[in-house]
């Protein structure tokens, strides 16, 4: 019998994680969704219609206290609650084993533990965490232990960068590196200019600007590949596209290699131990070609360049929504397999 799972926060990632689970035949059974800021009818609407990923292929109806979803002849009744305090969400009453914490509001160990006060056994945070252990599927997920009850899937950018970084570091060694992600618009940005805390540029209109921004993705990679600590950092440019982002990793290598040798190493990993996580393309692709791409990172052999045999710029694409949501599900299922 499939494990019982809950979702807290029915935003971009919460909804897409549910879509991924449904597309896979619901290998973990979502029994409760909590979101205090949206009605059940509105939940059904934003789940059914998606500007980026298209209309849901089944039916979804908002009823009193639940969503009724039908897909491929299967009917799924999912209870809905609207608690602001995670400790008050009826996870225990619903026998929820793992909560997918996708609200973005409870990303520390202390805050995530509130879900456990509500009766959940484990919490999977769908964002980087300041103190919870972080795992990138395909890179270090095998180190997740059964007794780790709060853990993070890191960020979409970390999930793109880490597999590529692992291949390059394992094969050639990275002396130091700088990462830039050219990142699509996200929900935290503004449609028109407005105030934005200390990072004033983040408050500028998303559709009309390229916005330099900070990112913890490179630092998070050093949490999953500790030997790179102090040797890798990065930044972000937010750009006015709806979805799909791209990582530029500029690195100094320990072992000299031609660009062709680097491409061969990545292709070998993409067809081997990182198959399904890391992809490889040598075609003339652009960002929209990767909408709906389930892999974490697709290396673009045509886009990268080498200055010499020890200084290279490598490029890898990712669907920052769908690819990341697939890894959330993979890490969820892996955690449920541990005893």
UniProtKB/Swiss-Prot annotation:
EC number assigned by the record: 1.2.1.12
Alphabetical UniProt keywords: Cytoplasm, Glycolysis, NAD, Oxidoreductase
Active site residues of this protein: 156
Pfam families: Gp_dh_C, Gp_dh_N
Listed pathway(s): Carbohydrate degradation; glycolysis; pyruvate from D-glyceraldehyde 3-phosphate: step 1/5
Reactions that this protein is recorded to catalyse: D-glyceraldehyde 3-phosphate + phosphate + NAD(+) = (2R)-3-phospho-glyceroyl phosphate + NADH + H(+)
Subcellular localization: Cytoplasm
Listed CDD domains: GAPDH_I_C, GAPDH_I_N
Residues that hold D-glyceraldehyde 3-phosphate according to the record: 155-157, 186, 215-216, 238
SMART domains tied to this protein: Gp_dh_N (SM00846)
Main location: cytoplasm
Coiled-coil ranges (or none): none
A GO molecular-function descriptor: NADP binding
Protein biosynthesis among keywords: no
Residues at which NAD(+) binds: 12-13, 35, 84, 320
GO BP annotations listed: glucose metabolic process; glycolytic process
Gene Ontology cellular component terms for the protein in this record: cytosol
Alphabetical list of InterPro entries matching this protein: GlycerAld/Erythrose_P_DH (IPR020831), GlycerAld_3-P_DH_AS (IPR020830), GlycerAld_3-P_DH_cat (IPR020829), GlycerAld_3-P_DH_NAD(P)-bd (IPR020828), Glyceraldehyde-3-P_DH_1 (IPR006424), NAD(P)-bd_dom_sf (IPR036291)
Residues at the site labelled Activates thiol group during catalysis: 183
Tree of life domain: Eukaryota
Annotated TM spans: none
PANTHER family associated with the record: GLYCERALDEHYDE 3-PHOSPHATE DEHYDROGENASE, GLYCERALDEHYDE-3-PHOSPHATE DEHYDROGENASE-RELATED
Family: Belongs to the glyceraldehyde-3-phosphate dehydrogenase family.
Quaternary state and interactors: Homotetramer.
Name of the protein described by the UniProt record: Glyceraldehyde-3-phosphate dehydrogenase
Organism of this sequence: Mastigamoeba balamuthi (Phreatamoeba balamuthi)
Protein's gene: GAPD
